[in-house]
Amino acid sequence: MIRLDDGHQVGVSVGGRGVPLVFLHGLGLSRRAYLRLLSRVAALGFLVVAVDTPGHGDTHDLPCDAGELGDRADLVIRTLDALGIEQAVVAGHSMGGRLTIHLAAAVPDRVLAVILFDAAAGASFDAAVATVTRSPRQILRTITGAMSDMYRDPFWMQVAAASRYLRMLTAVALGKILPPTGFTGAARAIMQSGECTSLLRVIRERQIPTMVLHGASDAIVPFESACEVADDANATLYRVRDACHSWLITDPRRGADSVRRLLDGALGDVLRHAAEALGVDDWRDIAAWDRRLVEPDALVRTLNPDHNLLGMDVRGRVDMELVRRADHPKAARRAAVVREFLRPRDARPA
């Protein structure tokens, strides 16, 4: 855990060394639910930073007058400032995916790439969220979808995830009766965040490389929503076969293999271009990334002095189908953005 300048407590886990990768968890969970996945991702050459969002895990709630999803993204940004991380790949699952979209749109120059795992986003999802409080039929459909998705996952995930989504619906249905804290505050922030299309278009316009991975059998956020996210953000889209909403948690080996596959493809291309812009000779040189993207006296170094990670065990195998390939932005333009951000502040043009 760390404390920000204003005293706000934030839960953080750090592991590995290399390209900073910030991970944001799903609704009602915490960073700890993903540690089996993230320890394996760290072994691929990443400095993994998992952050508990407000009201989850070890992170304290936000004040009542800071209940927007943008306020939650701002807390993550301030956490990165405190840790001394200049730029990072930002990844999120479910609610964390929606929060990742907000963060990338707010500070695009600090985001090397975006990875969205079954993100709670897309025009269809936004429309469902907008009508859920007014339509008993939509509430029933949401509950049915959640239960259907849980049926395909292991029993403990069925119980846990069904509980989370029923609690979310309860929070929405009771409106202002419940205090906007913890789970209720996060659920309400999602429900009140409006359409994310404009934010996805910022990602497109700023040419932030984005990869969308979505379970083919996700009944909570249907694959149609992932297609809409990819179209709006100009993202590369993969359909993960035999995967439901919580596949990252239930099968962390497959989750880690999906990141490895990205490194062999779209994400590897992004990092090669970024390495060239930063003067890194070998994009797989984890020490070089560490020097360029993490401040020498950064707090994150004290949290991970031995570059702790569990290492890769028996590799899983994920079945990913490429559905949409992003229109490649001009590499020179994106590289210029990377170089400009990492220039000393007193050397940047006013």
Over which residues does each language-model region extend?
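Acidic catalytic loop of the alpha/beta-hydrolase fold
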Residues: 216-221, 245-246
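Short alpha-helix in the alpha/beta-hydrolase fold that links the catalytic acid
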Residues: 222-230
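Flexible "cap/lid" loop of the alpha/beta hydrolase fold
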Residues: 105, 114-145
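Conserved alpha/beta-hydrolase catalytic His-Asp/Glu region
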Residues: 125-130, 144-205
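Short beta-strand/loop motif that positions the catalytic acidic residue
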Residues: 206, 212-214, 218
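Conserved HGGG/HGGXW glycine-rich cap/lid loop of the alpha/beta-hydrolase fold
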Residues: 8, 13-58
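Active-site loop/oxyanion-hole signature of alpha/beta-hydrolase fold enzymes
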Residues: 5, 50-91
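Catalytic histidine-centered segment of alpha/beta-hydrolase-like enzymes
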Residues: 243-256, 274
